[in-house]
Curated annotation (Swiss-Prot):
Keywords: Transferase, tRNA processing
Protein name (Swiss-Prot/TrEMBL): tRNA U34 carboxymethyltransferase
Family of the protein in this entry: Belongs to the class I-like SAM-binding methyltransferase superfamily. CmoB family.
UniProt keyword NAD, yes or no: no
HAMAP family hit by this protein: tRNA_carboxymethyltr_CmoB (MF_01590)
Source species: Azotobacter vinelandii (strain DJ / ATCC BAA-1303)
Top-rank taxon, per record: Bacteria
Entry keyword annotation includes Cell wall biogenesis/degradation: no
Function: Catalyzes carboxymethyl transfer from carboxy-S-adenosyl-L-methionine (Cx-SAM) to 5-hydroxyuridine (ho5U) to form 5-carboxymethoxyuridine (cmo5U) at position 34 in tRNAs.
Reaction(s) this enzyme catalyzes, per UniProt: carboxy-S-adenosyl-L-methionine + 5-hydroxyuridine(34) in tRNA = 5-carboxymethoxyuridine(34) in tRNA + S-adenosyl-L-homocysteine + H(+)
EC numbers: 2.5.1.-
GO MF annotation: an example: methyltransferase activity
Amino acid sequence: MIDLSPLVRRLAGTPLAAWADSLPAELDERLTRSHGDLQRWKAALQALPALTAERIELNGRVSLSGTCHEETRAALRQALLGLSPWRKGPFELFGVLVDTEWRSDWKWQRVAPHLDLRGRRILDVGCGNGYYMWRMLGAGADCVIGIDPNWLFFCQFLALRHYLPELPAWHLPLALEDLPEKLEGFDTVFSMGVLYHRRSPIDHLLALKDCLRPGGELLLETLVVDGDVGTVLVPEDRYAQMRNVWFLPSVAALELWLRRAGFVEVRCVDVAVTSVEEQRATEWMTFQSLPDFLDPTDRGKTVEGLPAPTRAVLLARKP
């Protein structure tokens, strides 16, 4: 489904070369035991019409444009809808607006001013459908590798890559645990919206550090709560209807976790309450979303009576 030979060539002579050499066989093996819906998603990819991106914008937004007749645009729209639900975006593709559940561009506006990604080799952990990977290239990254074991997200990435085949971005259907230990080959590692799903958050931070070269930079974005260095919320059961949320620290506690994991120059650069305008149901994601997960009488609380989602962005460096 994806030719990794350009990635292997690009990483030759780097600390990631041996890992890259192993990836084609690993991807082939994973495809043999993939998701049951993969054939349906493959059919949607095969239905994508042949179009040429004459204008590509990845900096202010993710937008591809070029000659596209109405009949072709309708076929494109139908093929993309076949890859629903779309969580991260939005994307503008030849006149089709993929209005995703999340306004991920709003998060990127909070993150991007604090980073210089020019010439950086980047790993995006839990990359979803790759929206942020394209934005990283727009910010000048040398190459971006995203990992996420979700096969639908992988196919959504391939839909974009269908029209951007030459750009140095690769999505691998892997989890962080599938990577070799002590890779130490990335200049920048992103972990956004992942930490609170981890039963062992310190181990997650240590694994992220293992992926960075000495002096490399981590960008961590996760759910937080108000409080001091000793404050950590552990939901009794669900949080905003999610069962797989384990630890929501205060910013001060999260900074301590990063220092204990061996990071230096730890700093919080943004804290923002997630609004119902930023995360909501759309035609492209028709299931329940944030408005359904908040107390209808008090949007400062979830339906479980816990603090509503607030997200912090932290930067840290590996010594």
